Regions:
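Left-handed beta-helix
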Residues: 5-7, 11-12, 20-21, 26-27, ...
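Short beta-strand-to-coil "C-cap" segments at the C-terminal boundary of structured domains/repeats
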Residues: 99-103
Length: 105
């Protein structure tokens, strides 16, 4: 069963959101509609572990045994199949990191 942290929300009631049953989603995440969080690829077998305060925008796909850091923003219709560090902003298909946000103290 997927583990979903406290305060995490699914846009539009989770319309067309697919979450692999072994995935882990941290606290205070925001998952848009039409998002897939799925299993395996040959380079990163397994399922995603998503950190806290992550925004996954509509139509995005996150898959494989990867770790998405805290405070990450994944833009709309982005495909992510590689690990992301904390505070990354990633967009595109294939996804690419366009910025690392400064952490606030």
């Amino acid at each position: 069963q997927a583990k979903i942290g406290k305060g995490s929300k699914f846009g539009y009631g989770g319309i067309s959101v697919v979450v692999h049953h072994d995935s882990v989603i941290g606290e205070n995440c925001s998952i848009g509609q039409l998002v897939t969080i799925g299993g395996g690829n040959s380079k990163y077998p397994g399922v995603p572990t998503i950190g806290n305060n992550v925004r996954i925008s509509c139509g995005s796909i996150v898959f494989g045994g990867i770790t998405i850091g805290n405070n990450v923003v994944i833009g709309a219709h982005t495909v992510v199949n590689f690990p992301l560090p904390d505070n990354a902003v990633v967009v595109g298909n294939p996804g690419r990191i366009v910025r690392i946000k400064e952490s606030k103290c």
